[in-house]
Amino acid sequence: MSAHWTFKTKELEDQVENQRRIDQELKKKVLKLEFCLRETRIQTRKLQKMGERNDMAIQEVLNEQLAAKKQHEADLSSNQNLWDKSGFKIIVSMSMLILVAFSRR
């Protein structure tokens, strides 16, 4: 009977040792996974910052292009409005009046 209990004890000790080994291996794997997760988060933050910087740069370029377009449109409208200005109309009217007056003489 004593041999039976000795065998059972040895068997249980072997199982405990196997469980310890498995536990240590799992702990190592968990540590590796935690490290990988940490590195992934760091890389994700870096990529987010790069994306934000790129978005800001694109926004600045778009704002500059919009401002240039508005300035160009304003320049065009000021040139087109030359015909609508009252001073220009007066000068043209006076010039035509003078031309008509000289052409009748």
Swiss-Prot record:
Its main location: membrane. It comes from the Eukaryota. It is a single-pass membrane protein. A motif (Bipartite nuclear localization signal) lies at residues 8-29. GO terms for cellular component: membrane. Signal peptide: none annotated. The chain crosses the membrane at residues 82-99. Keywords: Membrane, Transmembrane, Transmembrane helix. It is found in: Membrane. PANTHER family: NUCLEAR ENVELOPE-ASSOCIATED PROTEIN 1, NUCLEAR ENVELOPE-ASSOCIATED PROTEIN 3. This is Putative nuclear envelope-associated protein 4. The gene is NEAP4.
